[in-house]
């Protein structure tokens, strides 16, 4: 009976840690070195911000490469070498031809830079 009681306590502990958020806490992101393939349309953003990072990219007002403003969510890839900023990547997965000409980066809908920026394929923005 004592073995069953210990097993039951262990299972309850694991369950509470897992679903209570204790066992699955994220660890510090790994240092990331940007990588691309020649045929992809992508950009990188280095920023200390972590909340709802998005990219808005276009050729003209009729040719958007992202969802409507503020755009598509960027993927957290890791950190810079000294760990002071996160590196995000966005890769276009649609069927439009060409490469965007303009880009805006946002956090929670707020622009990082007040003006539109030129889009550079595989560009690294800081």
Where does each model-flagged region fall?
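Bacterial N-terminal signal peptides
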Residues: 9-21
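Low-complexity, acidic Ser/Thr/Pro-rich repeat tracts that form intrinsically disordered stalk/linker regions
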Residues: 23-38
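Extracellular beta-sheet/turn segments enriched in Thr/Pro/Gly and aliphatic residues
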Residues: 30-34, 117-126
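Flexible, charged surface loops at secondary-structure boundaries
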Residues: 35-37, 95-99
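A short, solvent-exposed beta-strand micro-motif common in secreted/extracellular proteins
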Residues: 98-109
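Bacterial N-terminal signal peptides that target proteins for export
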Residues: 1-11
């Amino acid at each position: 009976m004592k073995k069953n009681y210990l097993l039951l306590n262990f299972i309850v502990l694991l369950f509470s840690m897992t679903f209570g958020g204790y066992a699955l806490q994220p660890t510090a992101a790994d240092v990331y070195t940007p990588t691309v393939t020649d045929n992809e349309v992508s950009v990188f953003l280095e920023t200390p911000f972590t909340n709802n990072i998005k990219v808005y990219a276009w050729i003209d007002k009729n040719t958007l490469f992202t969802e409507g403003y503020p755009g598509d969510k960027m993927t957290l890839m890791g950190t810079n070498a000294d760990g002071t900023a996160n590196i995000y990547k966005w890769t276009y997965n649609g069927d439009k031809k060409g490469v965007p000409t303009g880009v805006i980066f946002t956090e929670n809908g707020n622009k990082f830079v007040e003006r539109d920026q030129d889009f550079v394929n595989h560009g690294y923005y800081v």
